[in-house]
Amino acid sequence: MMTAQPLLYDPHRTYDENYDTGPYNIDENDYREKSEPQETFLGFPVHLPFGVAAGTLPTSRHTNAAFRMGYDVVCYKTQRSSDFPSNPYPNVLPLDIDGDLTLEKLVDPVVAKEAFPEDITHLSITNSFGVPSRGPEVWFDDLKTAVAGAGAGQLLIMSVVGTIRPGETADEYYDDFAQSAKLAVDAGAKAVEVNLSCPNVASEGIVCYTPDAVLEICKRTKAAIGDTQLIIKVGYYKPEQQELLELIVGQVAEYVAAVSAINTLQGTIVDKDGNQALPGEGRSKSGICGASIKWAGLDMVRRLHALRQANGYNYEIIGVGGVMTPADYEEYRAAGADCVQAATAPMWNPKFALEVKESLT
């Protein structure tokens, strides 16, 4: 049964239903600040460098609702240069995680719960969508509407990703990132985020841990989008990957305006009987979001901030992961984040940005 609860994204509905009919029961009032913005992010004036990360706002209806709710730096859900289906429903399951989801805990399967809690402060969830897209034939014009929906002191970021196609070369894959980003700019995006925490066509690994792939994607994308601000979205680098992180950051610092960290932590998801919880081939593992990954997001922000200070890099940092309370926003800022974004909390608590702003007054 569908409830009257306000939801930016309803996990009890399919992705396509959310795309076609969401968001749900959102207050029609406009809570945007009327005063002059006092802060900046990527050179743009913003009321508060806080918003919604890529993932749960698939249309301009969703991004415009987020802007009205006072989120000032909002990501349009990651899109591709061609049509791509969503993973089967369900995509978002509540998880049974007590405290931090440490690397040690990730060795074992994570158990999915049967019901979402009323108090989402400690909620963690699966994020298993597969980066669906209806292609630029649909999203290009809708992105124009989304960009226009940003008020004074607000910024719309467009997230894009390359698509692996059968028989394609690595070069063609890397160029597809640039093509998708160029389409976003042509539609009016003032900042583009490329999702690098995705599979690499050249290997079995993830792009953001492959230095050559990251460098090529950044070079080609920056050449394609010119003066438009380029953001890269990365996953968590384990302590033993610190040298890899330093190498990659050093290579791309001249191309990127910001680094967003983190996307998710990857874990094996099972039901209470130990069986695969998410239906379908290739879905034994899923990205995990929510309260339990905050430690990893904070750790990455601190390390990126330390690298920036030590080497004189100019990139800004977007802190993402487990931002569930106003105190989490402040913790990320104290760690070195220039902007903070949430994804899980705003789904169930559309007025979360207002709570963050209220806590700062």
Residue ranges and their predicted role:
Residues 54-57, 159-163, 234-239, 314-327:
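Glycine-rich beta-to-alpha transition loops that act as phosphate-gripper elements at the mouths
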Residues 83-101, 268-286, 333, 345-361:
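C-terminal helical cap(s) of enzyme catalytic domains, especially alpha/beta-barrels
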